[in-house]
Every structure is written in structure tokens, then in C-alpha cells.
UniProtKB/Swiss-Prot annotation:
UniProt note: domains: Ubiquitin ligase activity is mediated by two distinct domains, PHD-type zinc fingers 2 and 3. The use of these distinct domains may allow ubiquitination of different targets by each domain. The HECT domain is catalytically inactive and does not contribute to this activity.
Cysteines paired by S-S bonds: none
Listed name of the protein: G2/M phase-specific E3 ubiquitin-protein ligase
Main location: nucleus
Keywords: Apoptosis, Cytoplasm, Developmental protein, Metal-binding, Nucleus, Repeat, Transferase, Ubl conjugation pathway, Zinc, Zinc-finger
Organism: Gallus gallus
Gene assigned in the entry: G2E3
Zinc finger residue ranges, PHD-type: 78-127, 142-192, 236-285
Recorded GO CC terms: cytoplasm; nucleolus; nucleus
Compartments where found: Nucleus, Nucleolus; Cytoplasm
Record's keyword annotation contains Cytoplasm: yes
Taxonomy, superkingdom: Eukaryota
Zinc finger (C2HC pre-PHD-type): 10-50
């Protein structure tokens, strides 16, 4: 075919109906204006009713135009078993399996598509799997491509090398590597096996394009290798002639990172005494440190091991040994530079760094839970992504203020009155004033008052008549609320709360969230989504009828129930129950709440939130469908950035702070982690959008700790002993919070 014609408006693919143009997932999307055809390459390759009957230069890659039109017409009669829309051109090749689906839907449902031979496709029930022995270790290991942790579990997202039994990959990492390397360079990253490795990856659905590697197709791809990196990347460069100045055989000679070679430093800037001394950049030290953390296994420490500062951080003491006091634990931790700075590997390297490198640093590795599951880690990544999106939406907020007068004893009505007042604008800065002081914690910043207001408001909405269900809730049908447009107001309040720094809802059911972001017509409910126990029990009776006579008897007994749902129909076969159950579920879970759902969706469109939810479903699912994790010492540690002057003993001060967080988390303190956060920020939890400004810690020559809620800054005293530090912390925090509650 002649040169492709591309349509700027990106029409949908004629096979799957999706407008997405993502070559990595769906193949190249091409539009042929003269034939009025737009196709994803993978949708065409995987379609079950079409073959390449032409030469490579005929039609579309050998697929004749008339054959493509016939396949489109055939698919138009087939409904996708996943999204319930027409155009399902791909069918499972397993015998007796009649499932059909679109290519993008199949990817989401974790189907396997084999890009070889007959281009077979397998549904989520019949897809090929890798066999894992029960004797194998279930401890997570590193993906050899991205170096992140990967669970040793039979999951769609996890693949194991057929040639190296201890080599594991993320499916996504393998797919991107295959697309880049092509059939000539795609091989096992450990042993370089090509044939056996490619055969297994093709069987498991990895697409290996028949092309040369991307780096071989680029002109002068290796040109950069002919140049040596000559730049000092140390935060505080001491060279008066600039970062690019390089004088061989002097202290101003630039030395490159021994691991990556893409970062450099003057010898003097990193206190390197001679050229022979090794040096690694911050990024490489962080990667190696994380790798060593993940590979260590917890075991009891021998007495000799207790003297090793590095081991002390990574291992837990044996339960058979006497428990160390907080002071002795801190002495042990102090010997490990990983506690002080995550990018140092040698105990003395902290002192060799320039002062500016020690002014601000994260202490999160100190408390890192190395047994954290991948699911929790993934959830944290999603919440971080959602936080960044909310910060983008917050840019709409201007400096003009709108005051809300809130009565905590009647939170809903006072909030409703404030949101409906004539001068209320979601883009204005919200200032909250509580009109009743009884049983209320006073806050000295409007941020704290606003956070408390949104917290109380979310609790009220969660437990209101607008929702039904236990912990994971769906919308209910409240005619009076619908008449008063309260569903719209609730959606609007949630949107405003998230963008203005309020807490995450965390109580939505998966079915409700899917209806909001995908549309109710694209969602298939199940029995677990039915909130009414009586309705669920009736549907179960129909679903689990084992004979035609028992099914007909159950239908007769449920005559009024079926009539109310519009599902009365003659039952002539036992197979009729599946369609009946499906229609009942759609009615009671989705159709019944269509009006409240649409009103609620309109409210969520405030400040552009719903649009972002539709674009980033996974990220916002973590906020709407999952409760936030309990506040931990790790989270609190990661939240604060330490700032101090050069003359402060940063090591000892930070050590006291970390030891105190550990004591508080383990219950060895009269205050809680929530008390500490409230003392500094006026908030009892970390909002999804984060804090503005970001919380900081300063070690200053003050007598007692000071919490500056306007700046989210915690000023800590410099003490000689940990006990003195702990006593001052607890006395000040308890006294301050007690005074605010009185």
C-alpha cells in the first residue's frame, strides 16, 4: 500500500472502538482515509476471522481490504465478554470456550496473546501459565531489568526465566525490553540465552517484533560514548573556575562515578585524596543500598555481629537475646551511615561530604519495612501519582478567600449552606471558622481548621443516607435527597475537599468507582456488589438452582420481585438463569441508581477532578476505594526534611529524633504519632495532596520543641542525652495539646 494517511482527529479503531494511540500496548495505530479505516496493528493481527491472503505490499500488511471489512462486519455481531460492547473480533482458542473480547479489554483482563504461528489468543481462564514448584523460595527478589522487587507468585504480571531458575521479571519490563531489542537482541538478561528464552516469552504473550534493535536503527547512536563526562555534580562545588573546569593531576581533576560514569566530581569537592580512590555518585549508592536491603534475610545476631553498625540496621535482634534499651539501639544505629543518609555506604563518608550535602536529606530508609508487600508498595506509588495530579489541580486555586462558618454539631447543614452561598467559588481559598467551641480542638492555623472540617464532612457523607453498604459503599436511592440535589452537592464536596487538602474518602466500592470512571454501561456487577442482604439472597436462590424445575419454582415464588425489576420472562432452560441473574444484578446495582449516579458524577466534575479520575483510574482508586494506611514512624520520618546549621551535631540530633519515633510507634511514649503530626501541622493525618509548605525539622539551641503550623516546621532542641530529649518532647506535646482541648 502507498504511504499511510493519518487523521489528526484520531478516530477510533474499527475493530475495538478505542481511540487510544499507544503503540507499546496496541501496536501502531494507522488511518487509511481512502478506505475509511482506522486500525490498531495488534487488533488486526489478533482478530480470529482474518488471514493474510495478500502479499506484504497489498492491503494492510498483507491483509486485503475486503477481508478487513468482512472481519469488521463479523465482529459487529459479537459482544465483548468484558466490556459488553459489540465488535469483539478476538476469540479464545480453547476448545468449547466461546468468549470473545476486544484486544484492549483482553489486556486489562489479563488474557494472553501469542504473537507467533497462528496468533492464538487465550482468555483469562484458559491462558497458559508457568509452573512453580512448592519447594521454591517465595521470598521476593529483584527484577533483573528494573531492579525493583518482584514476588515469586504465579501472577500475570510476573514471569520467570526458563533458562535461569532464580531469574524473575515484571511482565511490563520484559515487554518494553522486547520492543526495544527486537528479535535479534532480545535474550535472557542473566545468561544471554536466546532461543529457549524467546520461545517461552512468546508462549506467555510477550510480543517480540521482527526488527532490528532500536539502538541499531538510530544514526550515530554511540556518538556520546566517544566523549568523556566532564562536569562536577556535587551540590556544593568548591571550584572557583566552575563545574566544568578540569585540571589533570590536581585536586581540580574531575573523577567519574565508577559504576555509571555519567556523574562526576572534583577530587576536592568530595574530599578524595588520590585518583586511585573509588567514588560513586548519589544515584548509584542509593541503588546499591536498596539492593542490599532487599537481599538481606532477617536472622538472629551473634554477639560479634552486634558490633557491626551496618549489620545492626539490617537485622533484627534475636528474641532469645535481652532486649536492648533505646539508647543502646541508637548507638548501634548511629554506626550505620544508611540511617543518616540513604546515599552513603561507608561509615566515615558522611563526614567527608560537603556541608551542603548534609543540609537537607530524607531519613526514610531508617524505618523502611523491608517485608512490605508489593501490593502495599504499588498502592503507595498510586497514591503518590494521585498526589501529583491533585497538586496540578490545586494550581486553579486563587488567593481570594471564602469563609465557611461551620457548626461541628450540624456539619452537613452548615457545610451545605456554605457551599450554596452566592459568593462561594471552588477556586477560592477556603477559610473555615467554627461557630461552636464545645468539645473542639482549637487550631492556630486555618489549614488545621480546614483539615478538621473536611475530615468531619467526609465522615458524615460516608455514614449518610446517600450511601449504602458496610465498608465498601455504593450509592443508595434517596428520593428526597435526589429532589434536593444532595448527590450533586456530595460529589462537589468530595472534589473540593481533595483539591483543597482534605482527606481521601476511602469508602467507595469498586463497582461504584468503576461506574464513575468507565460509565455504568461498561461495568458488570456481581453478587458481592448487592448491598441489600435480602435481595442478594433471592438472587442466590436463582443462581444456584440445580434443575429446571427448581429454577421455575423459584421464579414463581419471586414473581413480585422479578416484576419490580422488569425481569419477568419465560424460563425454558436451565441456562436461562445466567441471563436472568445478570439482568437482576444490573438492575439492583446499576440501573436503580442511574439518577443519583449521574447527579453525583456532575458534582465530581468540580475543579476537573472527574476528568483526571477517568484518565488515571488506578491512581484515584487508591484514594476512593482504600483507607489510608495507619500513620507509621516510617511515614512520619519520610514526611519531614531536616535542615540544620553546619555547627550542629546532625548525627546525634537525628539519631535522637529517629529513636523517639521508634519509641512512640512501639507504645513506649505517652504521646502518639498523630499527636506529633498535629503538634506540627494542625492535622491528625497526612492529606492525599500533601502539605504546603512541606514539613521540615530544624535543630536549634532552644529549650523546648516548637511546632510552627504556619510553616509546618518542627524546631527541636539540641540535648546531650536521649532521655532529656524524650522528656522535653513529651512534656511539650502533651501540654500543648491538653491546653488546646481545654
Amino acid at each position: 500500500m502507498s504511504e499511510n494517511n493519518f487523521d489528526i482527529q484520531s478516530p477510533p479503531c474499527v475493530l475495538c472502538g478505542w481511540t487510544d494511540n499507544c503503540p507499546e500496548k496496541y501496536g501502531e495505530k494507522r488511518t487509511y482515509v481512502e478506505y475509511n479505516l482506522t486500525l490498531h496493528n495488534y487488533c488486526l493481527l489478533m482478530s480470529s476471522g482474518i488471514w493474510q491472503r495478500g502479499e506484504e505490499n497489498e492491503g494492510v500488511d498483507g491483509f486485503l481490504i475486503e477481508d478487513i471489512r468482512k472481519e469488521v462486519n463479523r465482529a459487529a455481531r459479537l459482544m465483548c465478554n468484558i466490556c459488553r460492547k459489540k465488535g469483539a473480533s478476538i476469540g479464545c482458542v480453547a476448545p468449547k470456550c466461546k468468549r470473545s473480547y476486544h484486544f484492549p479489554c483482553g489486556l486489562q483482563k489479563e488474557c494472553v496473546f501469542q504473537f507467533m504461528e497462528d496468533f492464538r489468543s487465550y482468555c483469562w481462564e484458559h491462558k497458559p501459565v508457568q509452573i512453580f514448584s512448592d519447594k521454591e523460595s517465595r521470598e521476593p527478589s529483584q527484577c533483573t531489568i528494573c531492579l525493583d522487587l518482584v514476588e515469586h507468585l504465579p501472577l500475570y504480571s510476573v514471569l520467570r526465566s526458563p533458562c535461569c531458575k532464580n531469574t524473575w521479571f515484571h511482565r511490563e519490563c520484559l515487554q518494553y525490553q522486547a520492543l526495544s531489542a527486537g528479535i535479534f537482541f532480545f535474550r535472557c538478561a542473566v545468561c544471554n540465552n536466546k532461543d529457549k528464552f524467546q520461545k517461552e516469552m512468546l508462549r506467555m504473550g510477550i510480543h517480540i517484533p521482527e526488527k532490528d534493535a532500536s539502538w541499531e536503527l538510530e544514526d550515530n547512536a554511540y556518538q556520546d560514548l566517544l566523549q568523556c563526562y566532564q562536569h562536577c555534580d556535587i551540590r556544593r562545588c568548591l571550584c572557583k573556575n566552575g563545574r566544568d573546569y578540569n585540571k589533570p593531576d590536581s585536586k581540580w581533576e574531575i573523577k567519574r562515578c565508577q559504576s555509571c560514569g555519567s556523574r562526576g566530581t572534583h577530587l576536592a569537592c568530595s574530599s578524595i585524596k588520590s585518583w586511585e580512590q573509588n567514588w560513586e555518585c548519589v544515584e548509584c549508592r542509593s541503588i546499591f543500598a536498596k539492593g542490599k536491603y532487599s537481599k538481606r534475610k532477617k536472622h538472629s545476631l551473634a554477639p560479634s555481629e552486634k558490633m557491626d553498625g551496618t549489620t545492626c540496621l539490617l537485622e533484627e535482634p534475636s528474641p532469645k537475646l535481652p532486649r536492648q534499651s533505646p539508647g543502646s539501639q541508637r548507638n548501634c544505629l548511629l554506626q550505620s551511615p544508611k540511617i543518616i543518609c540513604q546515599n552513603n555506604l561507608s561509615p566515615c563518608s558522611l563526614l567527608e561530604l560537603p556541608t551542603s550535602n548534609r543540609v537537607a536529606m530524607s531519613l526514610s530508609p531508617l524505618m523502611s519495612n523491608r517485608n512490605c508487600s508489593l501490593r502495599k508498595k504499588h498502592l503507595r506509588m498510586q497514591r503518590k501519582e494521585a498526589s501529583n495530579i491533585l497538586k496540578e489541580l490545586k494550581q486553579q486555586i486563587n488567593t481570594k478567600t471564602t469563609r465557611l462558618n461551620i457548626n461541628t454539631e450540624n456539619i452537613w447543614n452548615s457545610a451545605l449552606k456554605g457551599f450554596r452561598q452566592r459568593n462561594f467559588r471552588p477556586t477560592n481559598t477556603i477559610e473555615v471558622k467554627f461557630t461552636n467551641c464545645k468539645n473542639r480542638v482549637k487550631t492556630d492555623s486555618f489549614t488545621g481548621s480546614k483539615h478538621l472540617f473536611f475530615h468531619l464532612l467526609m465522615l458524615h457523607i460516608q455514614n449518610s443516607s446517600l450511601f449504602e453498604g458496610s465498608s465498601a459503599k455504593n450509592l443508595s436511592v434517596d428520593p428526597q435527597a435526589l429532589k434536593e440535589n444532595l448527590y450533586f452537592e456530595a460529589g462537589k464536596m468530595i472534589a473540593v475537599s481533595l483539591v483543597h487538602g482534605g482527606p481521601s474518602p476511602g469508602f467507595f466500592s469498586k463497582i461504584l468507582f468503576d461506574c464513575l470512571v468507565y460509565g455504568p454501561e461498561n461495568v458488570k456487577p456481581n453478587l458481592d456488589d448487592v448491598a441489600d442482604a435480602g435481595v442478594a439472597q433471592t438472587i442466590k436462590k436463582i443462581k444456584y438452582s440445580e434443575s429446571l424445575s427448581s429454577l421455575q419454582s423459584t421464579v414463581r415464588d419471586c414473581y413480585d420481585f422479578l416484576a419490580a425489576a422488569g425481569c419477568l420472562r419465560p424460563i425454558t432452560s436451565l441456562r436461562d438463569k445466567d441471563m436472568l441473574v445478570n439482568d437482576l444484578l444490573i438492575h439492583h446495582v446499576i440501573k436503580r441508581i442511574i439518577s443519583p449516579l449521574e447527579s453525583f458524577r456532575q458534582g465530581l466534575k468540580t475543579l476537573g477532578l472527574l476528568e483526571k479520575m477517568e484518565m488515571h483510574q488506578d491512581a484515584f482508586s487508591s484514594l476512593f476505594c482504600h483507607k489510608p494506611e495507619n500513620l507509621s514512624a516510617e511515614a512520619l520520618c519520610d514526611l519531614f526534611t531536616i535542615h540544620s546549621s553546619p555547627d550542629v551535631n546532625k548525627v546525634g540530633a537525628a539519631d535522637f529524633w529517629m529513636g523517639y519515633l521508634q519509641d512512640v510507634e512501639s507504645g513506649e511514649s505517652v504521646v502518639t504519632l498523630q499527636d506529633i503530626l498535629f503538634f506540627v501541622t494542625g492535622c491528625s493525618s497526612i492529606p492525599p495532596i500533601g502539605f504546603d509548605p512541606e514539613p521540615t525539622i530544624k535543630f536549634l539551641p532552644v529549650h523546648y520543641p516548637i511546632g510552627n503550623r504556619l510553616l509546618n516546621c518542627l524546631e527541636l532542641p539540641i540535648t546531650r542525652t536521649y532521655e532529656n530529649f524524650k522528656n522535653k518532647m513529651e512534656f511539650t506535646i502533651r501540654s500543648t495539646l491538653r491546653g488546646e482541648r481545654e
